[in-house]
A protein has these predicted regions:
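Carbohydrate-active catalytic/glycan-binding domains of CAZyme proteins
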Residues: 1-201
Length: 201
């Protein structure tokens, strides 16, 4: 959908889906330093494609993110349910909800990981096209929620991780609330482990 203002009115830009497939959820857009925009998405699968300047079409189609099936890229294999096939199969730690950023020439992809319940993990790469290297855990499984989708930003020289949990009254897996924690990157550029705080920020 497109609009001239964040408050709308919104309208369907192309009259149909940009991409269709099983697990095609949780999209995120990353705009690189050269102005090129990329769309990432996926659940039990991970895809990406460069967008045209109109931001509503792919330049050269889309494909699976290189290394998605490689434990070195997205964490050790574990048995997960493939809902499309109706049976378990061995998959990497990546589960869903990719979020891509860039810092000091390094690309960071954080994502919900490990199946259900999810924790937040991440991988890094020297290029938007990979190769990706699994770097471990950023946050533990969310409180009172079986999912934990997140994304970090830098604002006025400070770093913040936004995520969701089920801590509000009557909250649970399908009644989630947004939360945010401030953090500082480690000296080597890696994410620190970010604990939950009751007060958040």
């Amino acid at each position: 959908a497109v609009a001239d203002s964040p408050t709308g009115p919104w309208k369907d830009a192309i009259g149909g889906p940009l991409a269709t497939g099983w697990g095609y959820i949780d999209p995120t857009v990353f705009i690189d330093d050269d102005g090129k925009a990329y769309l990432f998405w996926g659940n039990k699968g991970l895809w990406y494609g460069e967008l045209n300047d109109d931001m509503i079409s792919f330049k050269d189609g889309y494909k699976e993110v290189p290394g998605y099936h490689d434990p070195k890229s997205f964490g050790e294999l574990q048995s997960k349910m493939n809902w499309q096939k109706g049976e378990n199969e061995m998959m990497t730690q990546f589960e869903e909800a990719p979020w891509v950023t860039k810092r000091n020439g390094i690309y960071y992809m954080s994502y919900a990981a490990g199946g259900v319940p999810e924790y937040m993990g991440y991988s890094t790469a020297p290029s938007i096209h990979g190769p990706w290297t699994f770097r471990g855990r950023i946050m533990d499984e969310a409180i009172n929620s079986f999912t934990i989708h997140g994304g970090d930003i830098e604002f006025k020289g400070r770093n913040f991780m936004f995520y969701h949990n089920g801590l509000l009254p009557n909250g649970e897996g399908f009644r989630r609330s947004s939360s945010v924690e401030e953090f500082t990157f480690n000296e080597d550029g890696s994410f620190p482990f970010i604990p939950f705080t009751k007060e958040e920020i």
